[in-house]
């Protein structure tokens, strides 16, 4: 359909195209797209057994359809959820999607538009995925408070070890000593010298 003159891409032509090949949705003019047409494209590709049909969300401008795809993905292929979320257009992503995604995969915090990144959502993200949620960048430093790193420490051993050196505060180190005493014992270098040598919540406990 990409070789058809834009003027000739009527609703009928577009529907026939996506019924034959769901990925033709990419060539449908934005003003011709409807929720029904987008669902038809998804249905076509799913019918072919195409495991990547959810990637069509990159061509879907409707919140409700993208949300349907996310819910279906959660039920049938939860391991693909992050990849599908990445493909959703930033202007389509909204608070409802953010609050759906973060308890399932905290890494999604880094792909949210900045206006959707809030302290509460960062909290949920690190409770879900620890440092994996915020260690890849994409989250404003102003939201990465000391409490966020304490939550990362509490998440898991793996998350604890990913905490940047500069963020290993007395509170983080105390959490490590409390939850994973063997790490602190066997890897004393985990605790910065500045924390070991000062009177703090870490040294006084």
Task: Show where each model-derived region lies.
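Non-catalytic tandem-repeat scaffold regions and their flanking low-complexity/translocation tails
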Residues: 1-205
């Amino acid at each position: 359909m990409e070789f058809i003159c834009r003027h000739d891409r009527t609703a009928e032509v577009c529907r026939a195209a996506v019924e034959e090949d769901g990925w033709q949705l990419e060539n449908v003019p934005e003003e011709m797209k409807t929720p029904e047409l987008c669902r038809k494209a998804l249905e076509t590709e799913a019918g072919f057994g195409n495991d990547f049909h959810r990637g069509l969300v990159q061509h879907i401008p409707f919140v409700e359809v993208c949300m349907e795809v996310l819910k279906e993905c959660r039920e049938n292929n939860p391991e693909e959820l992050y990849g599908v979320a990445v493909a959703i257009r930033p202007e389509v992503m909204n608070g409802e999607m953010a609050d759906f995604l973060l308890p399932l995969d905290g890494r999604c915090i880094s792909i949210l538009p900045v206006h959707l990144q809030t302290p509460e959502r960062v909290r949920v993200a690190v409770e879900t995925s620890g440092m994996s949620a915020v260690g890849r960048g994409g989250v404003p430093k102003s939201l990465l408070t000391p409490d966020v790193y304490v939550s990362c420490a509490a998440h898991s051993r793996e998350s604890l070890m990913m905490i940047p050196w500069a963020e290993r505060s007395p509170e983080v180190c105390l959490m490590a000593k409390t939850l994973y005493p063997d790490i602190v014992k066997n890897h004393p270098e985990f605790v910065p010298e500045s924390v070991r040598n000062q009177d703090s919540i870490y040294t006084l406990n």
